[in-house]
Amino acid sequence: MSHGKMPLVLSLVLILCGLFNSISCEKQQTSPKTITPVSFKRIAALSQKMEANYKAFAQELFKTLLIEDPRKNMIFSPVSISISLATLSLGLRSATRTNAIDVLERDLRNLRVWDKHQALQHLVEMLHELEKKKQLKHKDIFFIDRNKKMNQMFLKEIDRVYKVDIQMIDFKDKEKTKKAINQFVADKIDKKAKNLITHLDPQTLLCLVNYVFFKGILERAFQTNLTKKEDFFVNEKTIVQVDMMRKTERMIYSRSEELLATMVKMPCKENASIILVLPDTGKFDFALKEMAAKRARLQKTNELQIGALSCAQDQDHLQDRFKHLLPKIGINDIFTTKAVTWNTTRTSTILEAVHHAVIEVKEDGLTKNAAKDKDFWKVPVDKKEVPVVVKFDRPFFLFVEDEITRRDLFVAKVFNPKTE
């Protein structure tokens, strides 16, 4: 592979999509209250509880996805999904809205629903800061039937509070609608996101697309001249050929006998890190069950170690239905006919949404700051210490972490780099 090409792109399309049976232009009996974006000073008082709630939600989502299909590649952004669910809840009322938002902020149930939306602004602001640094791209897009009129307050609120892009589109011809949505996403966001929408219900009048893209530039590059084809051991019966990247340097390393796994942390520019966790041979299923609970301890015990790192690179484009998973983490009504929206004339409403997450990591992206301390990370010629060999040639986990907040921006499970 030539110098400068991406070594790893993992993408997952998690199907979630908004279907409304009947959208009315009539005045609603219950209008939503205006939400004032919360300031950092107001966030401070609730920050500790919000952080615990966010981590609990991300952990439940992680465990649910693992149990659902442990032998499948997976990638999702808990931050982005949290924002999308909060956005959808703005279109709900009564118990349905309370159920959706309470799952995100479990310990803040005594607060008004609108105060909870203000509390969630810390996630929105964090993504906006990353976008300013051109490290991350995040967008929620509502495609709405131009032949129907929606409650204008709803549109104003989702735009103002969660910065949602609203696109009016003709839903009469579903095939043309699918093509139009897919073309818009490909042209405006990501050309690799082809055929994002594969099915639209005949009654669909609204479709939500949630997109999040991370472009990680490693501070210390892989040695591109050492990349070559090698075996990746999916299991005892399945072996696939992948491009294996290599580098030897001082690295952030951790070993857990409790989790039976090894961790390597690779800093990226602009306060983000790629964290790779490699379960021991034959211990992948054990790590699946214990990862959510024991990973934090693994990261706390890290140290600088001279290591010889080998990591598989490839591209995966995955698709999975998501709405049957949400009830398992406590969101029971949002995708059923029990959902009540203040945008409809009937109580029968079905909701779905599309979450498209992409990670791109360049193997050669040495930044200026990293160049200054490259002598610190490189292995001295006269060093007698034997490097620890860490070879990601079997199923592993990948996390993208924000170094300032310690939140997971992305969570990924690479089971087979050659399958979708």
UniProtKB/Swiss-Prot annotation:
Primary location: secreted
Stored InterPro entries: Serpin_CS (IPR023795), Serpin_dom (IPR023796), Serpin_fam (IPR000215), Serpin_sf (IPR036186), Serpin_sf_1 (IPR042178), Serpin_sf_2 (IPR042185)
GO-annotated cellular components: extracellular space
Location(s), subcellular: Secreted, Extracellular space
Alphabetical UniProt keywords: Glycoprotein, Pregnancy, Protease inhibitor, Secreted, Serine protease inhibitor, Signal
A molecular-function term among this protein's GO annotations: serine-type endopeptidase inhibitor activity
SUPFAM superfamilies recorded: Serpins
Entry keyword Glycoprotein: yes
Signal peptide: 1-25
Keyword Secreted found: yes
Site feature Reactive bond, where: 381-382
Glycosylated residues, chain numbering: 225, 271, 343
One of the GO BP terms on file: female pregnancy
Family (UniProt): Belongs to the serpin family. UTMP subfamily.
Protein name according to UniProt: Uteroferrin-associated basic protein 2
Organism of origin: Sus scrofa
